[in-house]
Amino acid sequence: MAQQRLDKIIASTGRYSRREVKTLVREGRVLVDGRIAASAEDKCDPLTARISVNGEELFYREHTYVMLHKPAGVLSATEDGRGETVLDLLAPEYRKIGLFPVGRLDKDTEGLLLLTDDGALAHDLLAPKKHVDKVYFVRTDGALGDADCKAFVQGITLGDGLECLPAKLEILKSDAQSEALITIREGKFHQIKRMLASRGKPVVYLKRLSMGSLTLDEGLSKGEYRLLTAEEIKNLRESGQFAQGKAGADK
């Protein structure tokens, strides 16, 4: 990998700002391969150099990928004066490295939300032509039936004339209050709520379970998060690169 400035490498971990790194170097508290760093502007290979600050070894990541179990009541934004955002749920070191949510969940929607600083991956997952699967659990007022499933497969046209791509509705429970799994491959504003409202079945609860190959970790409580594994990152990249077709056509 190309060499980078020491202050940039350390700042990428989110632990210290570049200004703080300069101070730490001046105080002799930064070691590179066991030697005291002479300057914050020194360059080294971030993948092979052993860098420590105050005796703690730091590990370089080109990009960061965080799986969050988003709770209701939190905004899918990096900052918003109207209320708490998903970044407010993260530890301070994750708030300094440019993470942003990949797509948005409504304020009252729960479930899987990916946060990253990898713009290329985010584009692949969100680009309309990619049609990456997103699966949701939904609870509605009103009994869902076969006619609703067929309408989803055919592609619902909303009241404002907006045409939705074919989607999949899998009914889990049909009663006065129904439950279902919905698979869509686009992300229009309030899409699932509007699709079901057009069928006379208003949504009372909505939770995203997966996006592409990435499935919400059942071990994460609402508001908790963890870093993605190397395997999850690899599979997610493949989801964005190779997704194609229509949700109602191949399942």
Task: For the regions a language model picked out, list residue spans one by one.
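Basic, flexible Lys/Arg- and Gly-enriched helix-loop patches that mediate nucleic-acid binding at interfaces
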Residues: M1-K251
